[in-house]
Design a protein with these regions (language model features):
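Non-catalytic accessory segments flanking P-loop/AAA+ NTPase cores
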Residues: 1-614
Length: 614
C-alpha cells in the first residue's frame, strides 16, 4: 500500500495569476446585468413564474448571503414591467345588508377616480336636495297634504254637529275630548234641568247621545288611518322631490362609467337608497317646521352620507406593471387585511370604510415575496396563507372570527378573488422540513428554486467573476480595484468555497471583503485598491476574531496542551482539529490516543465485527 505523497506549499493555494485577467482596473469592466453561476435557479424561477397552473408557487432555497432575495427581486421587477397592470378593487356599502360590504372590480386607476367622484356627488346631494325641500312649491304641497287630516276630521265632525243640532244636542270641545250635551231653546241643559224633563223625552235624548257618541268614536278611530295615509303621501312627496334632485346628478356620473356595468348597477342602488332614505338624510324627525321638517345638523348629515363613499382597497393608478411586493413582517393581519374600529361614546364602531388591505390584496395579480422563517414565526400566518392559496380568495376577518372565539357582530366583507404568485425564501433545511412534515406544502409550492453554493473556477467564469466584483464595487461606490486586488479576492473566494477548483457564490462575504479593502486603502491615502489592501483586510478580520485562536496557541506553547511532534508512539497520533466560532475558523493540533494490547496474531476486520462485512 503506497503512502500519500505530501503536498508542497505552493499546492495549498490555487493562485490567480494577473495574466489571466484582461483589464487594468475594475473601471474597465462592464457591470454584470444577469445572474452568473445560478443557471439552474434562474431556469426554475422562470418556469415557476411563467406557469399559470394552480399550486405552482415557489420556494427559493439556499443559505443566506447568496443573493436569494436580490436575485428574485431583480428578476421579478424586470418581468413585472412587461405585464399588464392588474385591476383596482373597492369596497362599497351593501344597501341590503350593511354588515356584508360588496366588492367592485375596476380598471386600474379607476378606483381612486370613482371615490373622488362619489365624494363630489355626496357634496352635491347635500346642496341640491335641501334646496329642493326649501322650494315654495314643495312647502305648499306639503301643507296641503298635512291640512287634509284636519279638513277630513272637521268635515266628519261638522256632519255630526248638524245631526246633533236637529236632535237638540250640542258638541262641546273639552281638554279630554269631545262631549255631548242636550239643549232646549238653544241653551245647554244642566243635570237638574235634564232630570226635570219628561221621562220619554229624557230616554229619547239619551238614545240620541249614545248614537252620536258611537259616530264620534268612529271618526276618532279613523283619524290614525288618515294620518298614516297622509304620512305615506308625505313620504312619497319627499321621495319624488329627492329623486328629481338627484337623478340628474347620478345620470351625469353614469355617463362617465357607461362601459362598467357593475358601476352602473351600484349607482342605481345609490339612487334608490338616497330616495328611500330621503327623510332620514335630509329631514329630521323632531316635528314640522317651516318647510314641513327641520334640516338635520351638518355632523348628522355627514355621518349618514358615509354609506355612499367608496373605500379604495387596492389602487394601481400609478403602477407601471404588475406589483412585486416584499413583506418583511408577514403577520396574520398584514397578509389578509383587517377591519379597524373607532371608539364612540365608549362603544367600538366599524363600517366598510374601515376595511384595510393586506399584502395579498396589494400583490394580487402580481408577485409576493416572503421570508419563510419570518412567516412560520408569526402565529396563524402560515395557515392563513395556505387557506387563501387553497381557496383562491381572501377573506378579511379578525383572528377571533377565524377561530370562532368571539360572538360580537362584525363585518363580513365579500371575499376577493386571489391570483398571486407567492415566493417563499428560506434555507434548505426549512424546505425539506416543510416538504416532509406538512402534507399541503407540496401541493401549494411545487417549484423549488435551489441556489448553487459554488461555481466552477474556469477561465471564463473567472472573467465573469471579475465583472461581478466590479459590479459590487460600483454598487457600493468604492474605489477601483487593480488586477492584483481582484486576483486576491478570487483566491479568497476559492478558500471560502473550501475547494481550489470552485468559487463561492456567497456574495455577502465577498462584498464585505471589498468594503473593508476599500477602507484600508483609504486609510493609506491610496486612490486604487491593491492586493496588499485586500490581504490587510483579510488579516484584520482574522485578528478581530482571533482572540481564542491566540490563547489556544499560547497554551500549546506553554505546554498546557501536550503535543509531541517527534518520534513515534504506539496507539497515539497527532491530528488537526478545525475550530469554527463566530464566522472565524482556525486549525488547532490535538492528540488522539487509543487503548492497545498484544493481539492473538489474528487480523481483525472491523466491518466484520460490526456485521457490516463478510
Amino acid at each position: 500500500m503506497s503512502r500519500v505523497s505530501p503536498l508542497k506549499i505552493n499546492q495549498l493555494t490555487n493562485r490567480c495569476s494577473t495574466k489571466d485577467l484582461s483589464f487594468r482596473t475594475t473601471k474597465d469592466l462592464k457591470p454584470v446585468r444577469d445572474v452568473i453561476g445560478q443557471d439552474r435557479a434562474v431556469e426554475a424561477l422562470k418556469f415557476g413564474v411563467e406557469i399559470g397552473s394552480e399550486g405552482y408557487n415557489l420556494f427559493v432555497l439556499g443559505p443566506s448571503g447568496y443573493g436569494r432575495h436580490s436575485v428574485v427581486q431583480n428578476y421579478l421587477n424586470r418581468l413585472a414591467k412587461t405585464k399588464p397592470v392588474p385591476s383596482d378593487w373597492c369596497y362599497v356599502n351593501n344597501f341590503v345588508d350593511s354588515y356584508k360590504p360588496l366588492l367592485l372590480k375596476l380598471p386600474s386607476g379607476t378606483g381612486r377616480k370613482l371615490a373622488e367622484d362619489m365624494d363630489r356627488l355626496v357634496e352635491d346631494f347635500r346642496n341640491s336636495v335641501p334646496a329642493a325641500f326649501e322650494n315654495d312649491k314643495y312647502r305648499m304641497r306639503r301643507q296641503e297634504i298635512e291640512h287634509e287630516v284636519s279638513e277630513q276630521q272637521d268635515k266628519a265632525l261638522e256632519a255630526v254637529k248638524k245631526r246633533a243640532k236637529k236632535k237638540n244636542i250640542t258638541l262641546i270641545q273639552t281638554p279630554s275630548g269631545i262631549a255631548l250635551s242636550p239643549t232646549k231653546a238653544g241653551e245647554i241643559l244642566d243635570q237638574d234641568a235634564f232630570r226635570k224633563l219628561p221621562e220619554k223625552e229624557r230616554k229619547k235624548l239619551q238614545k240620541d247621545i249614545t248614537a252620536l257618541q258611537a259616530d264620534i268614536e268612529k271618526i276618532i278611530h279613523h283619524i290614525p288611518r288618515i294620518r298614516r295615509s297622509i304620512q305615506r303621501k308625505v313620504k312619497d312627496l319627499n321621495q319624488a322631490v329627492t329623486r328629481a334632485a338627484v337623478s340628474g346628478l347620478i345620470e351625469d356620473l353614469k355617463q362617465e362609467y357607461s362601459a362598467m356595468d357593475n358601476v352602473q348597477d351600484y349607482l342605481d342602488k345609490v339612487q334608490e337608497d338616497v330616495v328611500e332614505s330621503a327623510e332620514e338624510l335630509f329631514l329630521s324627525k323632531e316635528g314640522p317646521g317651516q318647510g314641513g321638517g327641520n334640516m338635520p345638523t351638518e355632523e348628522m348629515q355627514v355621518a349618514s352620507m358615509v354609506r355612499y363613499r367608496v373605500n379604495v382597497l387596492v389602487d394601481h393608478g400609478e403602477a407601471k406593471g404588475t406589483p412585486v411586493l416584499y413583506e418583511d413582517n408577514p403577520c396574520y393581519n398584514n397578509l389578509v387585511g383587517r377591519v379597524e374600529h373607532i371608539s364612540h361614546m365608549g362603544t367600538l364602531l366599524t363600517d366598510f370604510t374601515l376595511i384595510k388591505p393586506g399584502m395579498l390584496h396589494l400583490a394580487n395579480g402580481g408577485y409576493l415575496v416572503i421570508d419563510a422563517m419570518q412567516l412560520l414565526m408569526q402565529p396563524f400566518a402560515w395557515d392563513s396563507l395556505k387557506r387563501c392559496l387553497r381557496s383562491r380568495e381572501i377573506r378579511v376577518e379578525s383572528l377571533g372570527q377565524s377561530l370562532s372565539l368571539v360572538s360580537t357582530v362584525s363585518l363580513e366583507p365579500e371575499p376577493l378573488p386571489l391570483d398571486v404568485k407567492v415566493v417563499l425564501v428560506g434555507d434548505r433545511m426549512l424546505y425539506y422540513m416543510l416538504h416532509d412534515l406538512d402534507p399541503e406544502f407540496s401541493d401549494l409550492f411545487k417549484v423549488a428554486v435551489d441556489f448553487e453554493d459554488h461555481m466552477d473556477r474556469s477561465s471564463r467564469n473567472v472573467q465573469m467573476y471579475a465583472r461581478l466584483i466590479a459590479t459590487l464595487i460600483q454598487k457600493d461606490d468604492l474605489m477601483p480595484f487593480d488586477r492584483g486586488a481582484v486576483a486576491r479576492v478570487i483566491e479568497f473566494s476559492s478558500r471560502h468555497a473550501e475547494d481550489a477548483e470552485k468559487l463561492t457564490m456567497e456574495m455577502r462575504s465577498v462584498a464585505d471583503l471589498l468594503r473593508e479593502s476599500n477602507y484600508w486603502a483609504r486609510q493609506g491615502k491610496a486612490t486604487l485598491v491593491k492586493s496588499d489592501h485586500v490581504q490587510n483586510a483579510i488579516d484584520q478580520a482574522a485578528r478581530r476574531l482571533g482572540r481564542i485562536q491566540t490563547r489556544w496557541r499560547e497554551e500549546t506553547v506553554k505546554g498546557t496542551f501536550i503535543i509531541e511532534t517527534e518520534g513515534e508512539r504506539v496507539g497515539q497520533i497527532n491530528a488537526l482539529s478545525v475550530i469554527q466560532l463566530g464566522g472565524h475558523a482556525f486549525g488547532h493540533p490535538g492528540r488522539i490516543t487509543a487503548q492497545v494490547r498484544m493481539g492473538g496474531g489474528e487480523v481483525i476486520d472491523i466491518e466484520r465485527e460490526v456485521n457490516l462485512g463478510g
